[in-house]
Structures are given as C-alpha cells and as structure tokens.
Amino acid sequence: TNYPPYNIIKTEENWYELQLAIAGFKDDDLNIEIRDSVLSVKGNKSEEDTNDYIHKGISARSFHRTFTLADTIVVRAADLKDGILTIELENVIPEEKKPRKIAIGGDKTLLTE
C-alpha cells in the first residue's frame, strides 16, 4: 500500500527525518515500534465518526506502514504536528567502520615476536 505518503529527508550528516502525512490522527491513534531493524508505524482512529457528510474526501482510514532500517540506524524521537508525523533517525557508525585516512610514507611499526 502507498498510504500514508512519506518523505525521507537528510537533515544533517548521519541524521534523517521520516515524515508521514497522517492528517486527522492524534498521538493516541498511533503505535510506533521497532523490532529487528524494522520500523513499524500503525494508525487506528480511536473515535467513531458520527458526522453526516455531504462529501468526504479526507481519508481517515487505518494504516500500517513498515520500513526496513540499516543495522546502524537508531530511532531517536517522534513528533506529530500539523498532520505530519516526524520520526528522527540517526546513523550511528561504529568507530571500526568509519573511514580513516592512511598516510603514505608514514611511520612504520615492525611486528616482532
């Protein structure tokens, strides 16, 4: 399913925002969890809609959206404002996996046993 629509934005080096357009949902209608590097976002409307619509074009259907994250991605925060759910993600790269510069002609260490 393609609902709800979303954006992924790089905000800084190693920081990202996942934004989902979920107009009409409240904090209590949402469930966000991560398990085995899969981020799951579920939305269920908690209240009955008793309005007598002439036209209903704004979707308020339940949804379940999943995102597979790299092992180095950590979910840091979530916020709901103006119908946009924003989830902050950080790419935490271990020191041993970070690129390092190798000097040419630098000091050499001899290994002795």
Language-model segments: which ranges?
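Alpha-crystallin/small heat shock protein
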Residues: 1-113
